[in-house]
Curated annotation (Swiss-Prot):
The gene is prfA. PANTHER family: LD18447P (PTHR43804:SF7). Residues 280-308 are annotated as: Disordered. This is Peptide chain release factor 1. NCBIfam families: prfA, PRK00591.1. HAMAP family: Rel_fac_1. GO terms for molecular function: translation release factor activity, codon specific. Residues 280-293 have a biased composition (Basic and acidic residues). Methylated by PrmC. Methylation increases the termination efficiency of RF1. The modification N5-methylglutamine is found at Q233. SMART domains: PCRF. It comes from the Bacteria.
Amino acid sequence: MRFSDNLAKILDKYENLGNKLSSGIMGDEFVKASKEYAELEDVVAKIKEYNKAKSELEEANNFKLEVGLDNATLEMIEDEIYTLENSLPKLERAVKIALLPKDDADSKSAIIEVRAGSGGEEAALFAAVLFNMYQRYAELKGWHFEILAISDTGIGGYKEASASIKGKDVFSKLKFESGVHRVQRVPETESQGRIHTSAATVAVLPEAEEVDIKIEDKDLRIDTYRASGAGGQHVNTTDSAVRITHIPTGITVALQDEKSQHKNKAKALKILRARIYEEERRKKEQERADSRRGQVGSGDRSERIRTYNFPQGRVSDHRINLTLYKIDEVVKNGQLDEFVEALIADDEAKKLLEI
């Protein structure tokens, strides 16, 4: 089907849905039609803008052919034609991006997990830096950042930490953060001034609701034990810590941050549900397009995606060859938008090559 025919078909569908909604339908039929109508609004607005520019260009070209035009009028028409010819490719691209298949998870809130990787205590300190960076970014975006669990080293580092980030389209903005983040800096304990390299792993999961993932009680094994602190000492005398295993997948979540077993269980179930949902989402994504696994958006957690070089004051994203020489703004202030927007644009460009 030609591009223009496809656009006409979408406009017809939008008009028919509008007529249907105004005809007095009720119940599930109304809900379904309303959802479809709302989903088409953005792309229809872009199609209309594109069609309007095409129509204006055709009119301008026809007017230019008329006999007896003075030089001033002719120059004005040629300027208009030049402007329209330059805007059409951009408008067409905007339409194609709006037509790209949507990831159902993009509109969801997210759970972020940061784990120290290679590099010992320095890696744990870097994991804490990353976790705080995402907290600052969430604050800048007006999202709600709720710490779910932190396993600290006792001297400021995090062995692992997780948080729930709630807001509009959180997952669509943060999903490209999944992967291995590397840091190069001189540790405070380094007397010779040598640069050390360490790493931390970030996983971003779409936060799943109960309607997304139904977990049967029979599929869970729940173990309780006494919470322990740094060095293994017990921090309370009740079995408040919880370990939940989803038997069909083998996915396990352990939590001991809260003094209440009930609260630990609720948080652990939230993380478990997100991990199961993400696993199912990844399988579907792989089935849809194996060829896209290697590109930005694959979220491969073994992939080294970004380096933070403190001596040089730079942050480099290796997937899109983008380097920013403002490490403090990025790390301390959470100013991640330049990376986020560039990664989204790169992902859209690669998807456009497939249609």
